[in-house]
Amino acid sequence: MHYLALFFAGAFLCNSLPHLAAGLRGEPFPSPFAKPPGEGDSSPLVNFFWGLFNLLAGGYIVSTHPLVFGINPDFLTVLAGVVFLGGWISVHFGRVRSRKGGK
């Protein structure tokens, strides 16, 4: 259970980045609350709060499962969550953007 929690911490922390960045830049960006979910654009404010939620969720998990940076199973598990979700959402949002006419 410990490693599953750390994997999700990495996924939450990774997912916070594009949403916080879009929200803070004042740009719309797809979110789970858009229509259709994950493809339509949500407002910058929605993205800011969704990114903040992900940041807090990932931070909470890491705070309850202390993490030492370095080559160790805990850190590599968090990194696996970052790599898995980062790879998946980069491909997903690349497809979404190309369907919208690229940018």
What is the meaning of each model-derived region?
Residues 1-103:
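Membrane-interface extramembranous regions
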